[in-house]
UniProtKB/Swiss-Prot annotation:
Name listed for the protein in its UniProt record: 4-hydroxybenzoate octaprenyltransferase
Documented EC number(s): 2.5.1.39
Membrane spanning stretches: 28-48, 52-72, 102-122, 146-166, 169-189, 219-239, 241-261, 275-295
An annotated GO cellular component: plasma membrane
Length: 296
C-alpha cells in the first residue's frame, strides 16, 4: 500500500518516482534506523513527556535529513554506482537525474530541515551544523578510509545531543553515552550492509569496515552490539531507567544473537536481512523507554 501510494505521485509528475528512489522514500528502513535512537534521546530528555512540538520537529527532521543524506551519497557515488550491480539503476547513475538537479534538491532538503531547527533554540541550531557537516562528509569517506561506517555512526547519532538541547536547553555528559551506544550499533549494522557489497567494493577500490574486518566481521559486529548495550545500561543507570528499559535491551540482545546466527554462511541476502532486522532492536529499546516512564 505504501509503495502504491508513492507510485501514484507519478500522476502529478512523471519524474516523481525518480526523486522518490533518489531519496529512498520507497525504502524506509533508513528512516527507522535514524528515528528510533533520536526518539530514545528525546523521551529520556523529556523524562517520558517530550513536547509535541519537538516530536514533530524531530520526526520530520529525521525524514528530511535522511532523504538529503541519500541524495548527497548518490551524488558522491555517481561514477561508482554504475559498476555495482545493486546500485547501477540508482537515478543519478542511470542518468535519470542530473548532478545539478541532485545538488539543488539536496540544498532544498537541508534548507527545509534547517527551518525546522530554527524552531528550537540556539544550542540546537549550532549543533545542527555539525550534523550537516557529517552528512556531507560521509559519502566521501569510503574513498579514503576503511572506517566510513564510523562517520555514518556519528551522523546517525547526531540527533541525540540535539534532542537533549532542544528539550532541556542543556547537554549533560551522560547524553554522550547514548551517542556512543548508537555509534557502535550503527557501525555494527552498517557492516552487515557493507558485507552485501564487499566483493564489488574490492574490485572498484571502495573501502569499508566489512573489508577491514575480513573473516572476523561477524564476531566484531556482535562485539560492537554488546558494547552498545553496555553503554545503554550505563546510561540507563544514570537516567534512572528501570525494568521496562532493561527488558527492551534484552529483546535487542536477542535480535543481535539471531543476526549472528542467521549470517553464519555470510550469504549476501542474509547479511542484508540482518541489516534490516536491526530496526526491530531499535524499536524494542524505544518501546522499553516509553513504557518505563509511562508505567511509573
Amino acid at each position: 500500500m505504501y509503495q502504491s501510494l508513492l507510485k501514484s505521485l507519478n500522476r502529478l509528475n512523471p519524474r516523481a518516482w525518480d526523486f522518490i528512489q533518489l531519496t529512498r522514500m520507497d525504502k524506509p528502513i533508513g528512516i527507522y534506523l535514524l528515528l528510533w535512537p533520536t526518539l530514545w534521546a528525546l523521551w529520556i530528555a523529556g523524562k517520558g513527556s517530550p513536547s509535541l512540538a519537538n516530536i514533530v520537529i524531530f520526526v520530520l527532521g529525521v525524514v528530511l535529513t535522511r532523504a538529503g543524506g541519500c541524495v548527497i551519497n548518490d551524488w558522491a557515488d555517481r561514477k561508482v554506482d554504475g559498476h555495482v550491480k545493486r546500485t547501477a539503476q540508482r537515478p543519478i547513475a542511470a542518468g535519470k537525474i542530473s548532478s545539478k538537479e541532485a545538488l539543488v534538491f539536496f540544498a532544498l532538503l537541508m534548507g527545509v530541515s534547517f527551518l525546522l531547527v530554527l524552531c528550537t533554540n540556539a544550542a540546537t541550531i549550532w549543533l545542527s551544523l555539525g550534523g550537516l557537516a557529517l552528512a556531507f562528509t560521509y559519502p566521501f569517506m569510503k574513498r579514503y578510509t576503511y572506517y566510513p561506517q564510523v562517520v555514518l555512526g556519528a551522523a546517525f547519532s547526531w540527533g541525540m545531543p540535539m534532542a537533549f538541547t532542544a528539550e532541556t536547553g542543556e547537554l549533560p555528559a551522560t547524553a554522550w553515552l547514548l551517542w556512543i551506544a548508537n555509534l557502535l550499533w550503527t557501525v555494527g549494522y552498517d557492516t552487515y550492509y557493507a558485507m552485501t557489497d564487499r566483493d564489488d567494493d574490492l574490485k572498484i577500490g571502495v573501502k569499508s569496515t566489512a573489508i577491514l574486518f575480513g573473516d572476523a566481521d561477524r564476531v566484531i559486529i556482535l562485539t560492537l552490539q554488546v558494547l552498545s548495550l553496555g553503554c545503554l545500561v550505563l546510561a540507563g543507570s544514570k537516567f534512572e531507567l528501570g525494568m521496562w528499559f532493561h527488558l527492551g535491551l534484552l529483546v535487542a540482545a536477542g535480535c543481535y544473537a539471531w543476526e549472528f546466527w542467521y549470517t553464519r554462511d555470510r550469504d549476501r541476502m542474509r547479511c542484508f536481512r540482518a541489516f534490516l532486522h536491526n530496526h526491530w532492536a531499535g524499536l524494542a529499546i524505544f518501546v522499553g523507554i516509553v513504557l518505563d516512564y509511562a508505567l511509573r
